[in-house]
């Protein structure tokens, strides 16, 4: 996956998680903490929510890794001058 695809996935996962956050009045980070502690009853919504959360974490790690690589390339190409910000097509 490239960064553009990763960002699309991350935004899609955020949207799904926000729907569940509104439904249960709880941030995903808090849900995940309670889930890890075994304090939440298993339900279809919880299983989906945990899946979205874990997948988003994985996608964010991949995004960060690709971004670091891209920044290294931009820095070496700019030779100490400010890096231009270009849209990715």
Identify what each model region corresponds to:
Residues 1-89:
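Extended, charge-rich alpha-helical interface modules
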